Amino acid sequence: MYEKYPSPIKCDPSMVAMSIKENEPVSFSYEVSFVESDIKWPSRWDAYLKMEGAKVHWFSILNSLMVITFLAGIVFVIFLRTVKRDLTRYEELDKEAQAQMNEELSGWKLVVADVFRAPSNPALLCVMVGDGMQILGMAIVTILFAALGFMSPASRGTLITGMLFFYMILGIAAGYVAVRMWRTIFVGDHKGWVSVSWKVACFFPGIGFLILTTLNFLLWGSHSTGAIPFSLFVILILLWFCISVPLTLVGGYFGAKAPHIEYPVRTNQIPREIPPQKYPSWLLVLGAGTLPFGTLFIELFFIMSSLWMGRVYYVFGFLLIVLILLVVVCAEVSLVLTYMHLCVEDWKWWWKSFFASGSVAIYIFLYSVNYLIFDLKSLSGPVSATLYLGYSLFMVIAIMLATGAVGFLSSFWFVHYLFSSVKLD
């Protein structure tokens, strides 16, 4: 199996010591014995990729399941006890009784004529939702392939290459979701879909390019070998312009041709005044991010250790399960928060539903700062700390877009379902 070295160097056994002179080569030799192993080729990495502490990962999953069960119970109560009961009572009334009841309505039923009023900065919301779905799809598909063993550490760079490939391909989904959401908000108007598609193609990549360029200038200024070569920047720009942008425009075209989602109720021209709240609504939105963070903070430690401490991370099966649980928790959290806002007659739910789940990014960034202070003591100098914070910022922006898109779309479905069950003239 193994061939012997053709011309080994023989040492003179009579030479006990060797006099080493300056600027002269030093000759030495060694022996290597190759022993054929009975380990199969597909299993050659098992000894290095065996991850200890599986109980910790299972504890993380169990913790996430407890959070999901708690939120699912709240959603169950909302649907079966509150919503179904109110809808049943409402539909059993005749028209005269309904007219009288409309004057005595309270809670979410009062905002029926305002709940689908267009939000502020609708184009930005559509762009962020489209980019979020693209990032989420890329993460799920990449982790799935890694869990199935298609991306092995034996081939360096396969994980990053796979992420870039799936991200560019899923530009179709980003353009489709953003443009169709845009047409839904503007009641079927397809004008401006090209502009929305371009913004989707440029928003998140532009943020990433700005952060990476700034950090790369720091590396160039410190004469670091870790700086990204200029040629690689050119390649990334060409991939973005020649593949990602056209695919996003194609997705936007299909989104413009697809039928928009029709609102079940009409919107009044004059917006309804929102009653004063006891507590700021955004305070509740920011606090909602603690629940999604609780589902992934244990797994986050292993990921950060792999990125910054050089430890091997190959439990992609656990990571895939945690990612799915995170999506479920984000959907449930945003749905519950949206219902709570509607119950206090706050019809401005669009952005709040996005950030109810997207606020998990704030806690991840705070965790990153904590990890920098207490765990990454080997980092020296402000340049290293700036690089770490810059990459962490890029990561949390991606997480905010992905989780926010999940929360918004689940809330949109819930609100549409809720008010489509109410029959109003």
For every predicted segment, state its role:
Residues M1-F59:
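Extracellular (lumenal) ectodomains and large extracellular loops of multi-pass membrane proteins
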Residues Y2-M15, E103-A113, T142-A146, V179, ...:
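Hydrophobic alpha-helical transmembrane segments
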Residues S14, M18-S19, Y371-D425:
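TerminUS-proximal long segments
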Residues D46-W220, Y253:
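Hydrophobic alpha-helical transmembrane segments corresponding to the first two to three helices
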Residues K55-T69, P122-Q134, A154-G171, D189-G208, ...:
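Transmembrane alpha-helices of multi-pass eukaryotic membrane proteins
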Residues I68-T82, Q134-F150, L170-R183, I207-S222, ...:
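Membrane-embedded alpha-helices of multi-pass membrane proteins, especially ion channels
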Residues R81-K109, T142, G149-G162, F186-K199, ...:
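Interhelical loop segments of eukaryotic multi-pass membrane proteins
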Residues R266, I270-K278, G289, I298:
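Extracellular secretory-pathway ectodomains of glycoproteins
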